[in-house]
């Protein structure tokens, strides 16, 4: 069964602003993330809660950071997948600060 969830972009924008302001007040202008590599689950398995994932790959936060720096320098390079890089970095920052 597939359930679609409507996610308002305005909510994402406002939540990002609120949470990044909080992060900045706690950590300053940068977060020192101690781990660079992380596990990812294949996209086709990530949201299948009824099957145990079997396809794992490695991601690298420094690569996500480089990719986002390029997008910021040249917004014409923006792609929807850049949101995944942003999400990976936000997860790394959030998990670092939450410890």
Question: How should these model regions be labeled?
Answer:
Residues 15-16, 42-43, 87, 94:
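Small side chains
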Residues 23-34, 51-55, 73-80:
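Charged, low-complexity interaction regions
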Residues 2-5, 9, 13, 51, ...:
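Amphipathic alpha-helical coiled-coil segments with heptad-repeat character
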Residues 1-40:
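Short terminal alpha-helical segments
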Residues 33-40, 59, 80-85:
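Short, charged, amphipathic alpha-helical segments
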Residues 43, 50-75:
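Long, amphipathic, charge-rich alpha-helical segments that form helical bundles/coiled-coils
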